[in-house]
Amino acid sequence: MSDPAPLCRLDDIPDRGSNGFYTDGADRRLLYMAIRRGNEVFVYENRCPHTGLPLDFQPGRFLATDGALIQCSNHGAQFRIKDGFCVSGPCQGDSLKAVKTEIRDGHLYLL
């Protein structure tokens, strides 16, 4: 088993906000999205299950206006933050692909 790969510092994700990240060697598209709620972080692949396109409106902006749901910038699909389940839109019933992570020493690591 390989060592966990660092993704970001916890402070890189605003509390009650989101940010996007890519790993070394990627083509600079945001490959992961992270949504923070206090000391809890939810990480998903930045890919809509409906079209496969990135979800962010602008780099790192994934949340609906009220911050309660993740919202796809292409067709307006909305997903629960806690589990990535689509509650409305063309992919209703599908889910975002969750990414396993851990928080350690103020950093977020991909497992």
Whereabouts are the PLM-identified features?
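Short cysteine clusters
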Residues: 48, 72-75
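N-terminal pre-ligand scaffold of iron-sulfur
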Residues: 1-66, 80-81, 95-111
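Axial heme c-ligation environment in periplasmic c-type cytochrome domains
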Residues: 89-91
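A short acidic, glycine-rich active-site loop
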Residues: 69
